[in-house]
Amino acid sequence: MVEGRAAPRGRTLAASSPAGTIAGLGRFNAIMALVHLVQAVALLLLSRDFRLPVTLSYLKFDPATTSLRPMVTTVAEVPLAWLVVAFLLLSSLAHLTIATVYRPRYERDLLRGLNRARWIEYAVSASVMIVAIAMLVGIYDLGALLMLFSLVAVMNLLGLLMEVHNQTTRQTDWLSFWIGSLAGIVPWIVVAISLWASSSYGDGQIPAFVYWIYVSIFIFFSCFAVNMWLQYRRIGPWASYLYGERAYIVLSLVAKSALAWQVFAGTLRPV
């Protein structure tokens, strides 16, 4: 160990966290796998066939005006229910994996103040969530959707980097946190611009549930960053990494459930 370097976070955690608490998290993951799966199956069975287009924008030469004109073509129509079911199933699979085959590695990582599996799952499931929200507000361009997906994925992978990198630092290095926060806020700005454009230049008839989705899921996404901040500041019960881990699991369930059932109530329920 480099002289003057503080002990790794995991050593303090290992000394202060009873094994029973870690075992409890294993069982909690198994329960969460079932809860997400039940919701996914219910939504798949109950939802009507509501599809949104995926488009491509391109330039085409107009011989009449001898200029290039922007064009849009629809390349696919995606059932919205599939997107909702996808992020629920991804979470269910991740929790099941953590509770079973990955559990020994998961428990070792928890003792070090680390959870790789969480960030990898979020990098995919949260990215699908933002794509669903973007399509609800009228963002259909494939390139734009891919960029939004990628930004949220990068945000979560920087969360992974934050935990891995700070295994070896004397003091918490917040660079990954702030870059991840920057990447994570951009999709919400893009969605807000689309909402504003629809209100200003469209017919202004944006369903109220779309605004509720935007506000509620933005708040939930922000709570993940707050949870990490509290963990690394060791404030109150967050002094134990396991408390923050349980908070992540609960936040993930609530955020995904809130989005899924708001989308169902607004667009997918049978009429």
Model-derived segments and spans:
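Polytopic alpha-helical membrane-helix bundles and their juxtamembrane interface segments
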Residues: 3-34, 38-115, 126-271
